[in-house]
Amino acid sequence: MSPAHALTGRPRFTYRTRLSSPAPRRLDGIDLARALAIVGMFYMHTWGHLWGDNVLRSAFEGRSSILFAVLAGVSVVLLTKSRDALTSVLQLVGRGVILVAIGLAISLDSVGPIVILVTYGFLYICVAPFVFRLNLLSAALAAATSTVALPVASFYLRRVLPDPPQFGATPTLGLVAQGEWGLFWQFLFATGLFPLLAWIPVFLTGVAAGKFLFAHEQAARWLVALGAPLFFLGYGGSWLFLRLSDFEARYSAFHPDGAEATEFLLHNAFGVTPTDWLSWLFIYVPHSGSIAELVSSTGISLFIIGLCLIACRSSVLFNDLVYPLRDLGKMPLTAYVGHILAIGYLNAHGHNIAEPGFALANLLGPIVFAMIWFRLFRRGPVEQLMYWALKPLSAVPAALRR
């Protein structure tokens, strides 16, 4: 990025760069997609709770976090495509460790179990180092296979694990301080709100998408063409399954709490599916980690990413008009951490971020801040701190070769 572009914060790059380019170029469409994920998260934590069920809540619920995770997988390709293997592994693991540390630090009681950064961090630590060198076909096969296999594995694993003291929990610093490592790992891998077994397929889908973007000129259009049918396959397949199988009536007769429990479980999940019926894996419920949810939500994520890339590349006017959102998308970690800290502060002082004034400030404040910040600096505040923390790792391979 040139100094002028770094100061203006409005670089104009195409959606595709050569594999031989010396450093990753900014992809405006990726920034826009990140911004949409951020806005979706803001909505779900504010107006989504205030207004109850509505079209926007249905559109964003569960999908914003999955879009984030797909984009995290794309970032693996951006981070490693111009680095050697050892430097890439060190950077990925280092990034993961920092994300885990930040996630634990902001997982306060006043925030509640909504912090996903620990899961993201372990994706970078445990998964990314083993998949970043896969070719496109291998990455795509890994994503497709895990989308089916890991929800099934999670289902049967959770049947033999002891029930957690609460559902929808996340790994927190409190668990670490209390030495509750068993619960920490159980929440992280299998029974928490963001279990790795459910998020690995999403992350791998992003890795495959990132490799595709740098391998094919028309990749963005193919992402749109692939994402739409995947969305309808997962969501429509779930709808069809519910009607053809008469699931609601049969499950209501089975469950001790009858139709009331069935209705609740069909619209609410806390990271995992119930383990009484395998059929839950074929039903779309936000935040359930079912096969249907993974297929549908990764599909719509690919569609959004492809559409954002096409729109930003095809129209200079559109690209300029959405630059406030693109600026927000260039500091996703800063926006996320600031949002979580705001929730914790307001909750601790008897307020709710869903109150109209706070909700509006929570949405507009980060956008205005990003617009001002990128007139002066190249990276977001937290992103710059991470860059400084990881920079020494780049010198390790050269030192080892001496």
Segments predicted by a language model, with ranges:
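Alpha-helical transmembrane segments and their immediate juxtamembrane cytosolic regions
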Residues: 2-402
